[in-house]
Amino acid sequence: MDDSKRILITKVLKNEVTEALGCTEVGLIGYAISLCNISYPFSIEKIEVTLNNGSFKNAYAVGVPNTKKYGILPAVVGGLLGNSKNKLLIFNDIKYDQKLEDFIKKRLEVKVLDGPLYCGVKIKDTSGKFFESLIKDNHLNVVIPKIEKEKISLEITDFEKEEYKSLELTDFLNYLDEIPEEIINLVEKTIYTNKNLIKGDFLNYGNDILSNMVNKTTSACNTRMTGENMPAMSVAKSGNMGLMATLPIISYDNLTENNFEKLKKSLLLAMLVTIYSTYNSSYLSSMCGCVSKGGMGAVIGLCYYKNGKNLKKLNSAARAFTANLPGIICDGGKVGCALKLASGCFAAYSSLYVEISHENGIVGKNFKECVQNISKISKAMGDLDCDIVKIMSKKEM
């Protein structure tokens, strides 16, 4: 492949495959809070957090690392106690303060707006001084305060995203022929980090290949969603998408060939496809991205592991997957996400063994058409978020 494509793919991977502690959206909130740099939190008179629908959903009922608590309030408190240099690992090494939570609870207001990823924070202290931060469009894009960018920026521009979307499945396959050392290291880190989240069985089915996929993937998801102080390697800014895209393949390898080189290439392909699916739709939406995007990554990665660069088989697997799960709603980050990942495992594995014609529903002729069609449905589901948020907001937390 030409150098420009290889450079683009490498940059995208370095930007989109990152370590995250806890659900990405509580990390987003904590990071935004920490950017306000409040030296004495008990001086706060009022704190206002504005989130887009998707960020609100994902933070509302999910565990926050190092707090033993769930939801937006402990994420805010954790952010006040954390170091902004940790970014999405903001809750790493914090010592939670219950008295501070009781204090902040009376002064916190959460607002929700429609649109792309958004986390804005406004704080007023008792002296009348104001503090502000804003992260938008992606989880690390800090708009306020202005911070010094790294000399070599990893941030992906809109133009580069469009360039990535124009790539073909064959480009991703060709990239596997000569993988940069830094990307090999990134994939290996992903294997060890995500496997480390597997703690027992969330769903104990048995020891056949599919059951093992489900057991391992749901166990890791449950570990994340309950707020264990253990990082995951996120893909396209989602830890659960990272788990869905990688753990079924890791499990398959463990029970079949134990071929580390083939495993790394299969996982890398799964990551590339998951990112590709995300760029075609959005980071957050009314459709469950773990299933629709991470699941598409998993099925293509599994098919590559099993059949190599067989485009006929790869396109067939994409069609079968598209005929199955797309359309499942996202009602926020929570323990129940593990059950959706279980469905994703079943859909990904079964897609290897069935042929579905493109004449079925939204199924496309090939991988690219399938991703584009799922993306269209995802965007059309946008209005659902308002109703999902209304239902969630009525609950006592």
From Swiss-Prot:
One annotated GO biological process: L-cysteine catabolic process to pyruvate
Name recorded for this polypeptide: L-cysteine desulfidase
Residues the entry annotates as binding [4Fe-4S] cluster: C288, C330, C337
Oligomeric form and interacting partners: Homotrimer.
Cofactor(s) it depends on: [4Fe-4S] cluster
EC number: 4.4.1.28
The organism of origin for this protein: Methanococcus maripaludis (strain C7 / ATCC BAA-1331)
UniProtKB keywords: 4Fe-4S, Iron, Iron-sulfur, Lyase, Metal-binding
Pfam families from the UniProt entry: SDH_alpha
UniProt xrefs under InterPro entries: Ser_deHydtase-like_asu (IPR005130), UPF0597 (IPR021144)
Reactions it catalyzes: L-cysteine + H2O = hydrogen sulfide + pyruvate + NH4(+) + H(+)
Domain of life: Archaea
Cofactor details (free text): Binds 1 [4Fe-4S] cluster per subunit.
Family to which this protein belongs: Belongs to the L-cysteine desulfidase family.
Protein role: Catalyzes the cleavage of L-cysteine to form 2-aminoprop-2-enoate and sulfide. The former then spontaneously hydrolyzes to pyruvate and NH(3). May be responsible for the production of sulfide required for the biosynthesis of iron-sulfur centers in this archaea.
Active site (catalytic residues): C23
Any GO molecular function: metal ion binding
